[in-house]
């Protein structure tokens, strides 16, 4: 998937069948990993070699939980005082091999797309803490609405055209 085409459901099913194939690994799969990756593997025992594994796999250690870093984007989150209305993915990152190879459209996973879209969330949170002079008091609002769409499918608040002022729409 180079990003310009769509992965059909049949292709994803075929990928799943390919992933079920096994191979015998004769080397330590922790060699050459970054400190961050090794930290995620703490508590996961290394199997005795050689070991039979699936050709492509989504392992529990591929899923990186949010912990206390989940941004307050859910509409019902009590920390959400900005009116965000976004669906955060279940995990902060999902580095599963099958998960990443099964992207139906484009090249970004839901987790990666959320990280990109989170820039406006962080921008609004930061800008709302700054003491803007009266003439610039709308800067946080204007910055936060540049990804909204008139049909209400934009982010970070899913505002529709009737909720957006003319400056918000520009």
What are these regions (language model features)?
Residues 1-170:
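Metal-dependent catalytic cores of enzymes that make or break cyclic nucleotides
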């Amino acid at each position: 998937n180079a990003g310009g085409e769509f992965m059909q459901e049949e292709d994803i099913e075929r990928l799943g069948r390919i992933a079920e194939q096994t191979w015998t690994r004769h080397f330590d799969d922790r060699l050459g990993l970054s400190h961050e990756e090794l930290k995620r593997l703490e508590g996961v025992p290394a199997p005795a070699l050689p070991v039979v594994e699936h050709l492509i796999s989504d392992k529990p250690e591929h899923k990186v939980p949010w912990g206390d870093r989940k941004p307050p984007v859910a509409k019902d989150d009590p920390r959400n005082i900005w009116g965000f209305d976004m669906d955060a993915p279940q995990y902060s990152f999902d580095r599963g091999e099958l998960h990443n190879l099964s992207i139906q459209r484009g090249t970004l996973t839901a987790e990666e797309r959320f990280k990109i879209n989170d820039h406006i969330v962080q921008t609004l949170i930061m800008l709302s803490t700054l003491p803007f002079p009266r003439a610039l008091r709308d800067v946080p609002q204007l910055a936060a609405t540049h990804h909204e769409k008139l049909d209400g499918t934009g982010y970070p608040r899913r505002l529709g055209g009737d909720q957006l002022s003319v400056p918000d729409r520009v």
